Regions:
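Conserved ABC ATPase signature
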Residues: 129-133, 137
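ABC ATPase NBD coupling module
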Residues: 62-79, 103
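Internal alpha/beta loop-helix hairpins
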Residues: 180, 190-260
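Conserved ABC ATPase "signature" region
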Residues: 60-65, 108-125, 176-177
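Glycine/charge-rich catalytic "coupling/switch" loops of P-loop NTPases
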Residues: 261-308, 325, 329-366
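A short, proline-enriched helix->beta-strand linker immediately N-terminal to the Walker B motif
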Residues: 148-152
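Catalytic Walker B motif of ABC-type/P-loop ATPase nucleotide-binding domains
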Residues: 154-158
Length: 366
């Protein structure tokens, strides 16, 4: 468990943040630029000092201002990966990785050199200098160096922010591999919700130095505070299920979710795999009667559980779909025409193609 409750005040900005998240896994600090994410990870690392508060990792006190405890940075066993790789230009990849080993000192070994090289796909780059690597390759080396310091916590401060889309997609599978194969908890800073959706096991929403919400990804995805950060087009429920049938020719799969089945757009994921899926509220259609003759592949019996206005003049309808919660975003006119009320039975319609790019494979332990 990572437990944080800290106050840090500087001219023009005040951080007052508290959260508790299970470990291992990836704890995402999500919010707009300037919300306090980097300040918070710097306080956790010990690079910045809290004015008040405490930080505990798996029961061990790292900071307790009342008791006068402030474990020095070098003794916290916390790895840190920045937006830029910060590799030593005069060393090759092997030398940069070995530097991480030197920082480990007498720390218990969490992961070895060969395992890091294999896990991050660095074998072919070991003799290259940083200038000979792409941005994504440099970030993988930075990850490896941090891992070889044998950390008990890894801080990742927007490690993909300086990369273009292609390089970002190159690095993401390696971050998934770290999450799925290592027992090292990670704090991942991002202002891109698709990264959070793909990687995180726990989310902390930050705004203006305050925690707006926290919890598992599927719970936070339903919180109204999220919409204020991501806007209306990215609001939607996050579901997890198991692939029960795969149709590689058509690029689709059946996903067992709750007590029902969804047909989704998904390739190259074996039957039996666990998948995390975001259903965007804008892509969900509601009907009060069964509908025939449509290309929509999913028509699910549902119950309206709540109706609320959003901040953009539309209506968010919360639905129980086979024991899972789904959101639909409709207009005020549609609400009046359908005469919806909590408790009403409706049909929830979702195009399989609308899930393309919003479904990600999870390891069994994620």
């Amino acid at each position: 468990m990572l437990q944080v409750s800290v106050l840090r005040t500087r001219p023009g900005f005040s951080l007052e943040a508290s959260f508790a998240a299970p470990t291992p896994g990836i704890i995402a600090l999500f919010g707009r630029s300037g919300s306090g994410k980097t300040t918070l990870v710097n306080v956790i690392s010990g690079l910045s000092v809290a004015d008040a508060g405490d930080i505990r990792l798996d029961g061990e006190v790292l900071t307790d201002t009342r008791a006068g405890v402030a474990v020095p940075v070098e003794r916290r066993r916390i790895g840190y990966v920045f937006q830029d790789a910060r590799l030593f230009p005069h060393l090759n990849v092997t030398g940069n990785l070995r530097y991480g080993e030197k920082r480990a000192r007498a720390a218990p070994q969490v992961i070895g050199f060969d395992e890091v090289v294999t896990l991050l796909g660095l074998t072919q780059f070991l003799q290259r200098r940083p200038r000979e690597l792409s941005g994504g390759e440099r970030q993988r080396v930075a990850l490896g160096r941090a891992l070889l310091s044998q950390p008990r916590l890894l801080l990742l401060d927007e490690p993909l922010a300086s990369l273009d889309l292609a390089r970002r997609e190159e690095v993401l599978p390696y971050l998934e591999a770290l999450r799925d194969h290592l027992a090292i908890p990670m704090v991942y800073v991002s202002h891109q919700f698709d990264e959070v959706l793909r990687l995180a096991t726990h989310v902390v929403l930050l705004e203006a130095g305050r925690v707006l919400a926290q919890g598992p990804v599927n719970e936070v995805s339903l919180r109204p505070e999220l919409q204020s950060i991501v806007g209306p087009d990215l609001v939607g429920a996050v579901l997890e299920g198991v692939v029960t049938r795969l149709d590689p020719d058509n690029g689709s799969a059946d996903l067992a979710v709750g007590r029902g089945t969804l047909q989704v757009s998904l390739r190259d994921v074996p039957v039996g795999s666990r998948v995390r899926l975001q259903l965007l509220a804008r892509d969900v259609i509601l009907a009060t009667q069964p509908v025939q003759g449509l290309s929509v592949r999913n028509a699910l019996a549902s119950t309206v559980t709540a109706i609320s206005n959003d901040d953009y003049g539309a209506v968010l309808v919360r639905l129980d779909v086979g024991g899972e919660t789904v959101l639909a975003r409709i207009t005020q006119n549609a609400l009046q025409a359908l005469k919806l009320r909590p408790g009403d039975a409706v049909w929830t319609l979702v195009k399989a193609v609308s899930t393309r790019g919003h479904a990600f494979r999870l390891a069994s332990g994620a």
